[in-house]
């Protein structure tokens, strides 16, 4: 089925848009962008050069995907932002592309990024994660699958979070978090196992 694209959206003619997408008025899509099938792009979304998006994604108002990295080392290299399939990316989210030539910022499949989340350059998030309201993930982090970040979590640069970890609200951490643990506090401490996943 052909995509439904508002004539009030600003889309570079070089951008590749899949089938059965709906793009609302005032969306902004640059030329070096690929969007798969069955995606919904709401008003005032900006999708920048280097973004490669799979199928079934829904992007809400005022989100920016593929923004220039907030990194003093960035010198204009050609880099990418990879978004997988069936992600739900809510309002006011910012996802930065990578810093160095050939680099990628990656969001996998079936993730839920709530309002105001930020994913910085070169970070890689696997599948089925939740980023709570206002959660900020700094550059070069690695996040496993089925991780839940509660509201207003701050993940400092180069941290790694294992599969199915649960991070409590307001946690600020710079060290690695093992799989299947509940972590919280500043400084971060471990508060047991994620029994919801393990049961």
Predicted regions and their residues:
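Structural signal for interior beta-strand "rungs" in well-ordered beta-sheet cores
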Residues: 3-184, 188
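SDR active-site lid
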Residues: 187, 191-199
């Amino acid at each position: 089925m052909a995509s439904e694209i508002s004539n009030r959206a600003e889309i570079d003619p070089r951008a590749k848009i899949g089938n059965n997408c709906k793009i609302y008025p005032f969306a902004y899509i640059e030329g070096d962008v690929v969007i798969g099938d069955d995606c919904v792009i709401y008003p005032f979304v900006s999708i920048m050069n280097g973004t490669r998006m799979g199928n079934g994604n829904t992007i809400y108002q005022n989100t920016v995907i593929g923004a220039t990295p907030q990194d003093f080392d960035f010198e204009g290299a050609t880099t990418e932002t990879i978004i997988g399939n069936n992600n739900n990316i809510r309002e006011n989210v910012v996802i930065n592309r990578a810093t160095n030539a050939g680099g990628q910022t990656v969001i996998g499949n079936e993730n839920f990024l709530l309002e105001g989340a930020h994913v910085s350059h070169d970070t890689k998030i696997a599948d089925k994660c939740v980023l709570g309201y206002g959660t900020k993930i700094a550059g070069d982090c690695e996040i496993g699958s089925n991780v839940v970040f509660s509201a207003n979590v701050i993940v400092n640069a180069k941290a790694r979070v294992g599969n199915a970890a649960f991070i409590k609200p307001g946690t600020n951490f710079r060290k690695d978090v093992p799989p299947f643990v509940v972590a919280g506090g500043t400084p971060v401490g471990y508060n047991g196992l994620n029994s919801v996943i393990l049961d």
